[in-house]
Regions:
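A conserved SF2-helicase RecA2
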Residues: 152, 184-190, 194-238
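Short, flexible/disordered intra-domain loops and linkers
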Residues: 128-138
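SF2 helicase motor core recognition
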Residues: 156-171, 191-198
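A short beta-strand element within the Helicase C-terminal
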Residues: 164-179, 188, 203-207
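Amphipathic, heptad-repeat alpha-helical coiled-coil/stalk segments that mediate oligomerization
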Residues: 137-138, 142-143, 176-177, 183-190, ...
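Helicase motor interdomain insertion/brace
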Residues: 1-125, 140, 146-149, 162, ...
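Secondary-structure transition/capping motifs at alpha-helix termini
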Residues: 112-117, 181, 196-201
Length: 238
């Protein structure tokens, strides 16, 4: 669980480790932590009491992640592709499995490189909205979709849980901030923009993962599995 959150972003890993320290043993709180997972095998009922040694490890993990929060390499790569490679001009959707990661990325971009650029956050549980100049204003998801279609929004950051059935052919590029362990979900992310009505002949996709991490190995396995699935069935439907 913690490795998966850390594989998404440093902030998601830090927040999860801190919540685990504070809430372990609180079944309701732990179910909230697990709510965004795409792996049904991870269940709160399987969690035993935390040992003193494990608590110490979590405390060290939180401290280490805190020390590195301002230097997340994924952020630098996202900025490079949006700005230097001009993906923002083509329209871009960024997917993350976790709201913590989506909100963090939108806020950092809005405070720094993308000041005065409206950034959409597309999520569930009434957490969708617009980030502008570092400030967040809640908006309905239908409003965000219309803003993308009209060209008012060039950048949308969405979570998997909220994005089923999302059709955004106006956007021409996709960044996977993290990688779901279910290969079908990874393919369906691309399907949000690679649809009838897409004006670009090719859709550019960037998959981000930390080198040497568990996510790096997952990417290798997903690539192999997706290739096998495409060979058998073609593009995966929604």
């Amino acid at each position: 669980l913690l490795l998966r959150r850390m594989g998404s972003s440093i902030i998601a890993g830090r927040n999860t480790a801190q919540k685990m320290l504070n809430e372990w043993g609180n079944d309701e709180a732990m179910e909230g932590i697990l709510g965004e997972e795409d792996d049904d095998s991870i269940e709160s009922s399987s969690m035993r009491d935390i040992t003193p040694a494990e608590r110490t490890e979590l405390e060290l993990t939180v401290a280490a992640l805190n020390d590195n929060m301002s230097a997340d390499p994924k952020y630098k790569i996202v900025v490079e592709y949006l700005m230097q490679k001009k993906w923002l001009e083509l329209g871009c959707i960024i997917f993350s499995q976790y709201y913590d990661s989506a909100y963090w990325l939108a806020e950092e971009l809005s405070k720094n490189e993308l000041k005065s650029e409206a950034i959409g956050i597309y999520a569930g549980n009434n957490r969708s909205g617009i980030m502008l100049d570092g400030y967040f204003q809640r908006k309905e998801r239908d409003t965000l979709k219309q803003m993308v279609r009209s060209g008012e929004l060039r950048l949308l950051i969405g979570t998997d849980a909220a994005s089923e059935g999302l059709n955004l052919q106006r956007l021409g590029t996709l960044i996977n901030l993290d990688l779901p362990w279910n290969p079908t979900k990874l393919e369906q992310r691309k399907g949000r923009i690679q649809r009838i009505g897409q004006t670009r002949e090719t859709v550019d996709v960037l998959n981000l993962r930390y080198r040497g991490s568990v996510e790096d190995r997952v990417h290798q396995l997903l690539s192999s599995r997706l290739e096998s699935i495409r060979d058998m069935f073609g593009q995966i439907p929604d």
